[in-house]
Regions:
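Transmembrane alpha-helices and membrane-interface helical segments
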Residues: 16-20, 96-99
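PRPP/pyrophosphate-binding module of the type I phosphoribosyltransferase fold
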Residues: 19-20, 29-32
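Membrane-helix boundary/helix-loop-helix interface segments in multi-pass membrane proteins
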Residues: 1-13
Length: 224
């Protein structure tokens, strides 16, 4: 094993982290469900490429369930998945993403799961770093997640969710190409990653975004 004796603790940390990361982005209607749909479809494509039929079937079922649920969860939501639903999605994605699908290159083995789950991972990391820097508990709920930043910049819920879908899709596509291409071609993915990174940086660092004073409470999103 690449990690040796660190494999077991690293696996536990990964599963707990991803499970909670997906739960933490469930602050706007349809966000966690849509991002999980994109991630599961990314895993489905990769599983088909590497001929992992069982994983492909599981991810097809998960993506189908999310797609069926999504119309009722979009703003204005008629049904909410709650913490139980979002943590379930995070757990399944975390477990399947470390099942050994990515054996082409050592760097790819590490990079692909981080890419396809990049949005919840980076949002959670920034949230924890920000809270610690402000002397708060990392588990303290606030309104400074990436989706809250978009709302504060003047986007409505549907627009904010659409922007995050695009970022998640770019990262998912990058994960697929990285799995199916050699190292030289994989370097070209830096263009897509830089594009996604520029958008993310603008969101996270745009501290003085426009606020909608007349916005309804349900447009503000849930604190996580």
């Amino acid at each position: 094993p690449i990690l040796g004796i660190l494999a077991v603790p690293a696996t536990v940390i990964w599963i707990v982290a991803i499970t909670n990361a997906v739960n933490l982005i469930d602050g706007l209607d349809g966000l966690a469900c849509g991002v999980s749909t994109i991630s599961s479809m990314t895993l489905l494509v990769i599983a088909l490429v590497v001929s992992e039929g069982n994983v492909a079937i599981l991810m097809a079922a998960l993506a189908g369930g999310c797609i069926g649920f999504l119309p009722y969860n979009m703003n204005p939501a008629k049904i909410f998945m709650g913490d139980t639903g979002s943590t379930f999605l995070g757990y399944i994605l975390a477990v399947v993403s470390i099942q050994g699908l990515f054996k082409f290159y050592t760097i790819i083995s590490f990079a692909v799961p981080f890419l396809m789950l990049g949005l919840p991972i980076f949002d959670t990391c920034f949230a924890f770093i920000r809270r610690i820097a402000h002397g708060q508990s990392p588990m303290h709920a606030d309104r400074s997640h990436v989706h809250h930043r978009l709302i504060d910049m003047g986007f409505n819920q549907k627009q904010a969710v659409a922007v995050l879908y695009v970022i998640s899709a770019i990262l998912g596509l990058s994960a697929v190409v990285l799995t199916t291409s050699g190292p030289v071609k994989a370097m070209l993915l830096l263009l897509a990653l830089c594009f996604a990174g520029a958008i993310s940086a603008r969101i996270f660092l745009g501290a003085n975004g426009k606020k909608n004073d007349g916005e309804k409470p349900d447009e503000k999103g849930e604190e996580k």
